């Protein structure tokens, strides 16, 4: 994968263009990419560490609150819970890709396939659950909801999202392997043409970005118009939240998908004709995909922590934890001779 993170970014190459010297068929000389490899060894582990720590903390809190404390869940709650689970599973793969960037893949062929597929499943499903949240918010504002809780259709939608993401990860399970240079990378048979490889790339862009972006754009624009028309309510805060959600999605996802689209076009028309351009493309995919996955760290803030109800649950949990700590400290501070009558003992001096 181009970024040592995204399993789908290099379907049209037989070797990892970031970590290896790649000989384009149109080139007369070999393109040496040592500086690209050195950049990846420094940038990817550092960025992944920050994303892993911050994202793991935020999404773990979301899962814990929704799973153990919030018993009455709405459809949005169910989507947010699934989104947090997807983000957690995505973040769990980052340490493996950080090690791969520095030392190569050391966990074997099967783990290479599973980790690559796990990344794709959760990256794609996360984008789809964002679209589901936007639809439910639009419906809640503009239509009279038929029921307040999450019913069977909501869970069916969640299952469909997961199944679609799993189907999209099949190429990772089939083509990813550990090559002779100990890197987890896709290897394609020669009979598979570049058009098929580019088609897989375009399918991922469509399902993982274009469709969610269009749904979110339409739903949140309609929601904003409905909020503006509503009398006697404070509109500024909800509108700011909607704007923040859309802006963060565009800033984090658009650059990566533009670069990914350029790679797909290059697979068909061979637009990259110089080594320097190829190196710049490698660095661009590393940086933009890292920014794209950082969205999983921001989801708890955008979709959960801004909500008043979730803040109340956090306060309740904090109070329970504080009460438990105080009780434990009080027990530890009680002296051994402070309770109950003492048995009479004989006293003497030596």
From Swiss-Prot:
Residues 1-41, 100-114, 176-199, 262-289 are extracellular. It is a multi-pass membrane protein. GO terms for biological process: chemotaxis. It comes from the Eukaryota. Residues 63-77, 136-154, 221-240, 311-350 are cytoplasmic. GO terms for molecular function: chemokine binding; chemokine receptor activity; scavenger receptor activity. One of its GO terms (cellular component) is recycling endosome. InterPro entries: ACKR4, CCR1-9-like, Chemokine_rcpt, GPCR_Rhodpsn, GPCR_Rhodpsn_7TM. The Ser/Thr residues in the C-terminal cytoplasmic tail may be phosphorylated. Gene3D superfamilies: Rhodopsin 7-helix transmembrane proteins. PROSITE patterns: G_PROTEIN_RECEP_F1_1, G_PROTEIN_RECEP_F1_2. This is Atypical chemokine receptor 4. It comes from Mus musculus (Mouse).
